[in-house]
Amino acid sequence: MNNLKKIEYSLKKRKRQESRFKIYGLLGIATAVTFLCIILSSIVMEGKKAFLSTYIKLEVYFDPDIIYTSNDQKEEDIKFANFQKIIKNSLNSFFPEISDKGELRKLSNFISSSEEENLMKLVLKNKQLVGQKITLWLLASSKIDVINKNPDMELIAEEDRLISDLELNWLNEIRSANNIKSNFNKNFFVKADSTEPEQAGIWGSLVGSFFTLFVTLILSFP
């Protein structure tokens, strides 16, 4: 009987230990999941602005004198046309009172340089746009994007701010005309590294990570 009692006692003790281990395991998993959720939510909350881009609405006139530099009106003319000037003219049309070259240069920095290529591709796809004026939403530069997403930065002293008081006044005029909006930042997922922050994306990193994992898996199997 003594042996049976000892066996029963040891079995009960083992079951209690197993139950405790299960509880500890579940608590460990629950703790890990909780911290993972906290980290992910923190990333989303802090980085959600990266998923949005700022766009400015402008009346864009595809001036044939700028686009076609030769009498033949060749496709090569479109590829080498000065679309930066077209964007400058569009901004100047919105602010006709600005005539100073320095101020015009600052104003032209409101729009991302990537839009020059986008306009070129647009005209190549539809050459009938030459000579026409259409309304387009153009991607804003990184500094305008940052200020637009963070209104509190407007309260910072001019010397510590990304843009001057004059540029801030222009931005407020654009806002007053409802010519600014935030849209989903698709470039973040389809573009790679860039020297221009508003054009940077994670595509290159994703592809690199995929192939790294792929090669690792291939080499890890016999």
Where in this protein do the model-derived segments appear?
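Membrane-topology segments of multi-pass transport proteins
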Residues: M1-Y24, A30, I43-Q199
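Charged, alpha-helix-enriched surfaces in structured cytosolic catalytic cores
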Residues: K15, F35, G201, S205
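Alpha-helical transmembrane segments of integral membrane proteins
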Residues: G25-G28, A32, V207, F211
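Transmembrane alpha-helix signature in integral membrane proteins
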Residues: A200-P222
